[in-house]
Amino acid sequence: MAELEIIDGIISDRESPTLEFKNCRGKLSKDFWPTYSAFANTFGGIIYLGVEDGTQKAIGVDDPEKIVKEVWDLLNDRKKVSANILSPEDISIIEVDGVPLVRVHVPRAERSRRPVYINGSMDDGSYKRNGEGDYHCSQADIAAMLRDASEDAQDSVGVDGMMIEDLDRQTVESFRRRMASMRPHHPWASKDDGEFLRLVGAATGNESDGYTPTLAGLLMFGMDCSIMQHLPNYHLDYLEYMGSGGGWTRRITTGEGEFPGNIYSFLMEVAPRISAANDNPKEIDGMFRVDDTQMMKCQRELLVNALVHADYRGHGGVRAEWHRGWFSVRNPGGLRIPLEMMMGGGFSDPRNPHIAVMLSLIGLVERTGSGVCFVADECRRRGIGLPEYTETADPRTVTVRLETPPAASSDASPIKAMMAEDGSVTIDDISNATGMGRSKVMRIVTRMKESGEIERIGGTRGRWVVRRR
């Protein structure tokens, strides 16, 4: 966060989900600790001590060193807080408008340490941040944090009262055919259904005692009515908003009996729509195409990523929306690793690793932690905005939004990006870098010149100038 802006002794910044002011002039106030818990359990934030309530006037603290010592003493008292997540650099004494304030940066706690609670009570001392306030966590909030804190895979538990015969056989057969076509010599291909499902993480047990579906197996291969008996909030939804009105023009949703409603069948239903909405009528084979475009791969990656990372006990379900110009996917559950680490690639922490394994066996999850990085790299190559991630606290969800420019605009974007970076770039350079034919590049460049998006200065030995529009 930038330094505070002071106007006539008043701090112009307002309290927010990640910013809080406390009076604390003479001593550390009791309401410091609910905010500490709330920031740690939500998105993190900064607390300034020495700011008058209501007026936001910087009044300072009388003895900042004493306040800092008290904070550290109580942070290391397990009767007061369940965990100290601060480093020495997180607490500092600063001067604002001539008076001393104490600045406390509270990072978001790692998932293994949440919930962070106070006064020795997880039930009564766990808080979350919502808007400008600190609120008690509900039992559902606490349960969700405890699920995330566990090192056990959320989708590995066996589903009581079910047998693998309760799974949708057609879905299992379709999955096995697809895997066999992609991995014809895989050693699991010859196994019977029970042992095959155990090996891929969809079942637990053995041949003599029988096999029980895991949660991953139920989600991948079960009927949606059976899934909802164990996960009442389960719902997968895909909507297109391609008309001139405000409502959706096409919808694929679970729970209506038109297809089995499990994750695998949902992906097989949605894939042709993603292709059609990309105005790409070539042959479709489930989620795969002969000429799968990079933008289609990005959209598929974001959808698969949401399905793998969803907290299916949370609220809201997985929802994909396609509007003119953008595509978004929302899943229940917060981020389990920092966004910066996720965008950098190379590390993944899925809630449902067994679902990830099954999708990797049919080519939908390729490399650990590389999917989001691939999408970001493709956006940079096209010269469009990076995927935007939004996380909400109540309900806890993650939404990612991706720009989807029309095909002509999409082809123009990498050309403009290259010209903006190097005005001396040639048509042949662009053709080689983008994979587009020289004649196609020429047509797009001519159109952009006519529309005023680019300009050529200096003839054949000149340079390109991109006009920001």
Question: Language-model segments: which ranges?
Answer:
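Short amphipathic alpha-helical interface segments
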Residues: 408-425, 432-434
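Short, charged alpha-helical interaction segments and adjacent helix-coil junctions
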Residues: 447-450, 466
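Conserved N-box helix within the HATPase_c
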Residues: 298
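Conserved N-terminal catalytic/coupling substructures associated with nucleotide/phosphate chemistry
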Residues: 1-294, 304-405, 426-429, 435-443, ...
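Short beta-strand "wing" residues that participate in macromolecule-binding interfaces
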Residues: 456
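Short, cationic-aromatic polyanion-contact patches
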Residues: 459-469
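Active-site alpha-helix of zinc metalloproteases
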Residues: 301
